[in-house]
């Protein structure tokens, strides 16, 4: 696993993109094209995975393609490259397909924000120089999975090849926005809104409930073991959602919705369906007082865990988030 790093130098590519965004905000170049055709529907990410696979040379396939059941497929870390071949090592057309796959597995609302986060956290390397991909199985002929990794990024596209598994397997996302050691307000962090919502639940709890929800130290980060599912309905960290009032439960649902918001609708819908199958009441919500930034009682580290799901949000020193959801056993 590569050590965490951060660069505060804005590369030319990022600068140009930010400049174009600023220009758009000022109305520059915003004149509509009369008679422009309606934008064609974009191909599904799974279709693009096959297109990308078909474009690979035999040499490239040897470097980045593996059997579907290869142990590397379900590996997860906070900062790693799944193969040695970087995105920038592919042809420009292939790079464009990879980016389109990445954008396609995220929601329209968040896709650009998430891409910008990965670009930023990759420093001078950018998305192309800081990311790598692998394909497991053979797209178009059976089970397959496309995996893209980098700093603060493990994303999957499997076309539902992994039945009963949300997002094709465990996910990781994160962001070091303003600095490696973020301040309590996590200025500019793409995912801090999720913690804000979670802390709203804490504020709704009464004294006894807060006592149950507040814990010492969290599970910490241990690669794939971080998202190991226990199958337990009781004895987990924090307060059981089944012990909450109706309005408190409703806010937990909002937390879950926020956790799913960055991802495309069909994947988020499947994930929430699996969470409900395990029983909302069986989920436990925990906040970790020994890992907080500042003394504001806005908890930076928290989690939701049930028998068939875990969403671990580690907001210190910056945001790392781990998610794994499966069909209940």
Where do the protein language model's features map onto the residues?
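A cross-kingdom marker for long, charged
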Residues: 39-58, 62-329
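Low-complexity, intrinsically disordered short peptide segments enriched in small/polar/basic residues
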Residues: 5-7, 28-31
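Short, polar/charged, Gly/Pro-enriched helix-capping and turn/loop motifs at alpha-helix termini
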Residues: 22, 29-30, 112, 266
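N-terminal secretory signal peptides
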Residues: 1-14
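Detector for intrinsically disordered, low-structure N-terminal pre-sequences
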Residues: 8-9, 20, 33
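N-terminal export leaders
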Residues: 12-28
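Bacterial Sec-dependent signal peptides at the C-terminal "C-region" and cleavage site
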Residues: 30-39
């Amino acid at each position: 696993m590569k050590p965490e790093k951060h660069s505060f130098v804005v590369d030319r590519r990022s600068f140009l993109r930010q400049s174009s965004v600023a220009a758009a905000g000022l109305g520059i170049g915003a004149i509509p094209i009369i008679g422009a055709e309606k934008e064609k529907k974009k191909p599904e990410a799974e279709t693009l995975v096959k297109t990308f696979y078909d474009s690979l040379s035999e040499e490239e396939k040897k470097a980045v393609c593996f059997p579907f059941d290869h142990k590397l497929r379900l590996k997860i870390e906070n900062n790693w490259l799944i193969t040695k071949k970087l995105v920038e090592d592919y042809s420009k057309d292939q790079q464009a397909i990879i980016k389109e796959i990445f954008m396609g597995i995220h929601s329209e609302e968040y896709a650009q924000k998430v891409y910008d986060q990965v670009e930023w956290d990759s420093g001078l390397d950018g998305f192309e120089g800081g990311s790598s991909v692998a394909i497991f199985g053979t797209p178009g002929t059976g089970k397959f999975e496309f995996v893209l990794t980098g700093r603060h990024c493990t994303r999957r596209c499997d076309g539902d090849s992994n039945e009963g598994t949300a997002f094709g397997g465990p996910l990781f996302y994160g962001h070091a926005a303003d600095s490696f050691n973020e301040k309590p307000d996590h200025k500019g962090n793409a995912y801090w809104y999720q913690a804000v919502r979670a802390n709203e639940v804490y504020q709704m709890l009464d004294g006894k409930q807060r006592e149950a929800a507040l814990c010492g130290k969290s599970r910490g980060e241990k690669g794939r073991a971080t998202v190991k599912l226990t199958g337990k309905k009781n004895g987990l960290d924090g307060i059981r959602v089944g012990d909450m009032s109706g309005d408190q439960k409703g806010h937990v649902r909002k937390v879950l919705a926020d956790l799913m918001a960055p991802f495309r609708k069909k994947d988020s819908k499947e994930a929430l369906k699996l969470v409900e199958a395990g029983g909302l009441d069986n989920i436990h919500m925990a906040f970790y007082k020994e890992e907080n930034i500042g003394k504001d009682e806005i908890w930076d580290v928290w989690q939701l865990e049930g028998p068939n799901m875990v969403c671990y949000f580690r907001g210190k020193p910056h945001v790392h988030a781990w998610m794994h959801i499966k069909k209940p056993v």
